Amino acid sequence: MLHDQDKDLSDDVRVLEDSLAALGLDRKHCIHTGPLIRRENEYINMNREERRMILTRMMSFIRKAPIVYKCFTLDKKFLSGNTAIHDALLQSIVRFLIDKADDLNQYDRIKLYYDNGQPQVKELLREAFAIYASKTTFISDVHPEKYRLFQAADTLCTLELARFKLQSGEHLSTSEFQFFGGLGNLNKHYFKPISRKLCK
């Protein structure tokens, strides 16, 4: 996800948090999209409509916030081992960064936020951003509950994974199908809106 920090997010965050409070949730409620869909953890006692209302609020935030994103996907069954996966992802990310060089070179600093969830991903990002090493700062002390953009990125990745599964001829999981209510609803209310935020 890319965000120019000169573009203020405070109004978008306030609207999101007001809307969560209107649902009876804590204003600072951290939205975890996977558990929300699967009805796990803090969402275990919520019905589908209650959970969908939460995701609707996050979708509204994503639509209105001054952000864009790029998702890198690959099919592991066509790659032999971790090294091949690493190399394919690295190539895709570096190609994207080179394509976006004119935009990225306008900035004096690039901040890269990652929560250290997977050390191999952190290392992959360090390698990819080596071409901007002199102005890239890695911020790894990232806690999802403190960063709405991190939660938005989680939502986008979850939806893109569902889209990738469908495009690859796989089926949605039972919990995904029950939550989204069919492919028409998924396309109309989720895939189409996030597609407008794809980095061109």
Question: Can you say where each PLM-predicted feature lies in the sequence?
Answer:
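Phosphate-ester processing/binding pockets and catalytic centers
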Residues: M1-K200
